[in-house]
Amino acid sequence: MVSIRLTFALAIVAIIFAFSVDAAYKKPPFNGSIFGKRSNTMTDYEFTSRALSAICEVASETCTAWMSRQESN
């Protein structure tokens, strides 16, 4: 009889803990969960894009200057 009561009490406690853990879970906001956060701050890919754009511009100017110098010789 005691073991049945103990088992029943432990089952009740386990169910209460299961509901309390479930209640602590909070879903992320839909706006940022799938599509990313929409803000005015620059993201990493924007910095990378600007850096690559600057490198390509410098390389293009250097190659143009070098090729025009090669043609004049």
From Swiss-Prot:
Transmembrane segments: none annotated. Residues 1-23 form the signal peptide. It comes from the Eukaryota. GO terms for biological process: neuropeptide signaling pathway. Keywords: Amidation, Neuropeptide, Secreted, Signal. Residues 39-73 form a propeptide. Expressed in brain, the retrocerebral complex and in ventral, thoracic and abdominal ganglia (at protein level). It is found in: Secreted. The modification Phenylalanine amide is found at residue 35. GO terms for cellular component: extracellular region. Belongs to the FARP (FMRFamide related peptide) family. This is SIFamide-related peptide. The lineage of its organism: Eukaryota, Metazoa, Ecdysozoa, Arthropoda, Hexapoda.
